[in-house]
């Protein structure tokens, strides 16, 4: 993934690290995660760490999740892919965000259709 990202140009800096043990020396205005959190054993712990240690005051976390209970089309993914995936309900993800210390927490579904419940998007801000 890093090689692919670097080959697309730009001036980004990419590195490989364990998300659960990584300690950032910097804080950030915006952190975005897409299709990551449900692979973690304890996403609540990671989101709390991001809220407390990685975001600047006024910084925002935005997370996109396609594998969640209300999205029935995603229920077979774990078996098809052969990788453990955490299946939570929308309200459970919302509670994780609210209990992490983030404020102004919002959520919505993006790109829903007849056969797809949509990407669950959650966001919150550090005060």
Predicted regions mapped to residue ranges:
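Conserved SAM-binding loop
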Residues: 5-6
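Conserved SAM-binding strand-loop segment of SAM-dependent methyltransferases
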Residues: 9-21
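Conserved beta-strand signature within the Rossmann-like core of class I S-adenosyl-L-methionine
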Residues: 58-66
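Short, glycine-/aromatic-enriched active-site segment of Class I SAM-dependent methyltransferases
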Residues: 65-85
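Short alpha-helix
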Residues: 84-101
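Core SAM-dependent methyltransferase catalytic element
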Residues: 100-102, 106-127
């Amino acid at each position: 993934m890093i090689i692919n990202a670097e080959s697309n140009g730009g001036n980004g800096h990419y590195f490989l690290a364990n998300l659960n043990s990584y300690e950032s020396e910097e804080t950030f205005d915006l952190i975005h995660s897409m299709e990551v959190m449900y692979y973690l054993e304890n996403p609540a712990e990671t989101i709390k760490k991001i809220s407390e240690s990685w975001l600047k005051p006024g910084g925002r976390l935005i997370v996109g999740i396609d594998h969640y209970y209300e999205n029935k089309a995603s229920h077979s993914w774990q078996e098809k892919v052969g990788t453990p995936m955490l299946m939570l309900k929308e309200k459970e993800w919302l509670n994780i965000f609210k209990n992490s210390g983030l404020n102004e927490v919002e959520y919505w579904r993006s790109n829903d259709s007849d056969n797809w419940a949509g990407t669950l998007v959650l966001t919150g801000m550090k005060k």
